[in-house]
Regions:
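Catalytic-core regions of core metabolic enzymes
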Residues: 1-536
Length: 536
């Protein structure tokens, strides 16, 4: 249940607020203040009357009615605090940062169950427990850093792991990737990855909402809902990429000890992602690189031109693209010779286009214009430009900026010199661009995207598992050990597994009529003895 009070709270209380910004209760209050939250902010601390300039109350029973409560107190104290806040203070959204719940012990799981029963009874949202929090442009209710640049058209990040969410943000910020929201669902007692996707799907506004979703998943509790809502969002124009951690036996065990996650078959995960149209990634760098690619204009083909002033990176990028089934076609003929004549002697235009270390911003502009207007066999351009620190790159990156604004073909900026050209890269990112610092990671990520299937064309239905009916069917099966076909069909339907239509008849005309109605091909099978060879 995702309430408006979670997304846009008019008032927030931090229970366990602290003046020590190195504690979760202090760090989250600091982030709320520095993030410019404009609603009413309250703190609960039994030893202070004021915390970081915010009025503090000794007990939750003393605060006014509040929309959102953030709990940074020991796990054992959380159930009673949630009960008081929901029952007496009209709180409709909770973020529980505390650990020590179902991810650790049975006793902790009991505490979680009590909290869940309370929030459900009062119609409140629950993020966590065991999470870093939630943030959007309205409020930064997280205790971690970095806080990324937030923008309505930025990326939505949903993560099972708080630490992984932080490390994904670290990776993304250096690339210039902006965010719309960050969801750390932790133990996902009430709200998990599937619930967030469902909310985004059911409330999707194509005019205002982010179209990019990045997921880090440790457990898929409801594969049907994940498939249904992910594919629905993609069909509405969204792009989704995900890491599913815990694919190995050891990894599954690690995930279980981390957030109490339940293992999923990796082959089943692969099939689900492919059917939904989700781009599967295997590392944080890959995920954020895919996210950056998603922000650029959509590719219309698989043919790439590479423009560089350094031969080695161009070769490695060519290899990475080729391994992924993408093309770096040879550029030749009169147009290529014409371009070569405008570059310094020794430059190469066969693709990669190498303008040499002495190449100028004007040479880069020329190459981009030729790739856009004159090379018909090129669908997109990769531009690799760094520096050993001998010259500045401002003019070169200004050319990239100008061309990216107007070019009819996507341009992928690969600016590897994030130290020696740090100021230039920062200025480039400040203009709203992203940067791919590593050409091989970019090539691999592009291959993932280009080779990911679209969502299944057939309508995906949200099937439920009817456990009571399954039990009745099993109980009705004869004790001789043979399960007749109609029992199998009933079990599959009750388990929510789609099956093809069947028809049993001993009449030729009826069989032909059925085939014409359903369409070919049709499989014919004898109904009768278990061993068909007994009857010929």
């Amino acid at each position: 249940m995702i309430t408006s009070q979670l997304l846009h709270p008019a008032s927030i209380v931090v229970v366990g607020a602290s003046n020590n910004v190195h504690k979760p209760g202090g760090a989250i209050l600091k982030n709320l203040l520095s993030g410019g939250y404009t609603g009413e902010l309250r703190a609960v601390n039994p030893k202070e009357t004021e915390v970081q300039g915010v009025a503090a109350f000794a007990d939750v029973k003393d605060i006014p009615d509040t929309d959102l409560a953030i709990l940074a107190i020991p796990a054992a104290l959380c159930p009673d605090a949630v009960e008081m806040l929901a029952a007496e203070k009209q709180v409709k959204a909770f973020i529980i940062l505390s650990a020590g719940f179902g991810e650790e012990t049975h006793e902790g799981a009991v505490l979680e169950d009590r909290i869940l029963e309370t929030v459900n009874r009062y119609g409140a949202s629950l993020i966590g427990p065991n999470c870093i929090g939630f943030m959007n442009s309205w409020h930064h209710s997280v205790f971690s850093q970095p806080i990324p640049q937030l923008h309505p058209q930025g990326v939505d990040l949903i993560s099972s792991s708080g630490a992984t969410a932080v490390f994904i943000l670290e990776s993304a910020v250096t690339k210039g990737l902006q965010f719309n929201s960050v969801w750390s669902v932790g133990n996902a007692k009430q709200i998990g990855v599937e619930d967030v996707l469902q909310y985004m799907d059911e409330h999707f506004n194509p005019e205002a909402d982010s179209r990019i979703k990045l997921l880090y998943i440790e457990s898929i509790g409801d594969p049907d809902r994940l498939l249904f809502h992910a594919s629905s969002l993609i069909k509405k124009g969204c792009k989704i990429a995900a890491i599913k951690a815990g694919s190995s036996e050891s990894g599954s065990r690690a995930a279980s000890s981390h957030t109490g996650a339940i293992a999923s078959s990796d082959s089943a995960v692969e099939a689900l992602f492919r059917k939904a149209g989700i781009v599967r990634c295997y590392s944080r760098e890959e995920l954020t690189t895919v996210g950056c690619i998603f922000t650029l204009p959509e590719l219309k083909g698989k043919n790439f031109a590479i423009i560089t002033h350094a031969g080695g990176p161009g070769v490695m990028l060519t290899d990475a693209l080729s391994k992924g089934g993408l093309n770096v076609p040879k550029l030749e003929g009169p147009v290529a010779e014409e371009l070569k004549g405008k570059l310094f002697p020794g430059a190469a235009v066969g693709n990669p286009i190498d303008i040499l270390a002495t190449g100028t911003p004007e040479h880069l502009r020329l190459c981009l214009e030729y790739c856009e207007e004159k090379f018909d066999n090129i669908d997109a351009v990769m531009a690799i430009f760094g520096t050993p620190g001998l010259v500045t790159m401002f003019e070169m990156y200004d050319v990239l900026h100008e061309k990216m604004l107007h070019c009819k073909k996507p341009i992928f900026p690969i600016l590897p010199s994030i130290n020696t050209a740090g100021a230039e890269v920062a200025a480039f990112l400040a203009k709203g661009h992203v940067n791919f610092a590593d050409e091989v990671t970019l090539g691999t990520a592009l291959s993932r995207i280009m080779n990911a299937p679209r969502p299944a064309n057939n309508e995906i239905e949200l099937f439920g598992v009817d456990v009571p009916r399954i039990r009745r069917i099993i109980d009705s099966i004869p004790a001789d050990g043979y399960i007749a076909p109609h029992y199998v069909q009933a079990l599959l339907r009750s388990a929510g597994i789609p099956i093809v239509e069947e028809f049993v008849s001993d009449n030729k005309e009826e069989v032909l009529a059925f085939a014409r109605r359903t369409g070919f091909p049709v499989v014919a099978k004898v109904v009768g003895p278990v061993h068909k060879s007994d009857v010929g």
